[in-house]
């Protein structure tokens, strides 16, 4: 929960995480200021990747790095031309969803409470059980959610032959969200 509360504030020592991600994906050193159009190839929205983190905070970046290190072949597949999938932005969206859903977001006022975005007591209990049995459960869940979003949901939509683009991302993400809710509410 502590990491979920840390928002990303550049420039700082956390830029090293961006540089690590860059080295891992491009097999070369990252520009000193980390500003480069190369970030678009990893699914960021622009050449300043820190701008995409917003409410996801530093935890989002750590989860992107974890995923890229463990699933480098999947990242390269996600970013192939024609797949129209934005790896980094999708990962950040999943991170932010998990942060809110599993009650890890610091709420500053009653207005921040949108109970539709919070998991049920049963789902939270199931999540806590998982954390007790697996120290890396949070990162593992993020990885599984992102793989499922891409391979099953997104590529499934692409295989239907319809013209699926970034504009269909919310539809795909809603499908993932519904599956997560159903899964964690299962006894």
Language model: regions and residue ranges:
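Extended acidic/polar regulatory tracts at the flanks of large eukaryotic scaffold/adaptor proteins
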Residues: 1-187
